[in-house]
Amino acid sequence: MRQVTLYRYSVPMEAGVVLRNQRLKTRDGLIVRLQEDERLGWGEIAPLPEFSLETLAEAESAALEQLAAWAAGHAFSEDLPPSVAFGLSCAQAELDQHLPQAADYRKAPLCNGDPDELFEMLQAMPGEKVAKVKVGLYEAVRDGMIVNVLLEALPDLKLRLDANRSWTRAKADGFARYVAPSLRSRIAFLEEPCKTREESREFARETGINIAWDESVREADFRVEAEPGVSAIVIKPTLVGSLARCQQLVQETHQAGLTAVISSSIESSLGLTQLARLASWLTPDTIPGLDTLDLMQTQVIQRWPDSALPLLAAEQLDVVWQS
């Protein structure tokens, strides 16, 4: 006997979370609960505003159609919006016990705010020191100076930088000028510095700063391949699609000799814990990019270890549909 419940959540965000010039006041999404006999599977469907192609309303419509068919005994379709494909495939994998329980809860901390506070926090970090800095929100020169200060002050630190295609080539070069050439090898990668792939490639070749593909991964003409100056592929399952698609991308990335990084699209704690399990399974040697829970004020259904944020139980969520 198959049973389905589809819930909706809306979690208030901390002040100051901005996605491509849009302030994100709440994170809204859907939670899927599948039950077959005594087995349960959970999944999260949460298109990211400004980044996902599908809206939450479109995702809900596609999910309802698929869940009604599943409850009647059919399999999920392969051709679905990415957030729906990811959430449904996670729920199915949990139900079938194909998503390993072991999780990688290490985080590359997201560095915002005062460099002095960042320095203290990073200095106290145990183990491999890998942190992430968003660049491109302020002046490129300022970004370069902050990155240089952090790398100079902490000789065992590696930084992942993310520019979200926000720089012209001239601005990207302005950033690079303020990072000492001797420190650039400790930039693990800079995600999509320029507005076009070709400009980003040129930037990497001319500055010696490695880049990673992120937005490009979701474009129809993208192919994973080894090329000079490219060190990593960032995989955001909510934006990429099903578990099978994520597995395929990780495999292609490793075969090309590149690093695959499983990364968050600001999912709730339920989605984040599943991403931690996915990272432990598919990319065990790489710290995932999952330090987004503290942007929210509440956890949903599944706790993230060591988080003190309050938890919303399933019973506290709105039910969209039940079979």
Curated annotation (Swiss-Prot):
Pathway(s): Quinol/quinone metabolism; 1,4-dihydroxy-2-naphthoate biosynthesis; 1,4-dihydroxy-2-naphthoate from chorismate: step 4/7; Quinol/quinone metabolism; menaquinone biosynthesis
Keywords, sorted A to Z: Lyase, Magnesium, Menaquinone biosynthesis, Metal-binding
InterPro entries for the chain: Enolase-like_C_sf (IPR036849), Enolase-like_N (IPR029017), Enolase_C-like (IPR029065), Mandelate_racemase_C (IPR013342), OSB_synthase_MenC1 (IPR010196), OSBS_N (IPR041338)
EC number(s) given by UniProt: 4.2.1.113
Binding site for Mg(2+): 162, 191, 214
GO MF term list: magnesium ion binding; O-succinylbenzoate synthase activity
Keyword Magnesium listed: yes
Pfam families, alphabetized: MenC_N (PF21508), MR_MLE_C (PF13378)
Cofactor(s) the record lists: a divalent metal cation
Reaction catalyzed: (1R,6R)-6-hydroxy-2-succinyl-cyclohexa-2,4-diene-1-carboxylate = 2-succinylbenzoate + H2O
SUPFAM superfamilies cross-referenced by the UniProt entry: Enolase C-terminal domain-like, Enolase N-terminal domain-like
Keyword Lipid biosynthesis annotated: no
One GO term of the biological process aspect: menaquinone biosynthetic process
Active site: 134, 236
Superkingdom as given in the UniProt entry: Bacteria
Family statement: Belongs to the mandelate racemase/muconate lactonizing enzyme family. MenC type 1 subfamily.
The protein's role, per its UniProt record: Converts 2-succinyl-6-hydroxy-2,4-cyclohexadiene-1-carboxylate (SHCHC) to 2-succinylbenzoate (OSB).
This protein's name: o-succinylbenzoate synthase
Native species: Pectobacterium atrosepticum (strain SCRI 1043 / ATCC BAA-672)
GN (gene name): menC
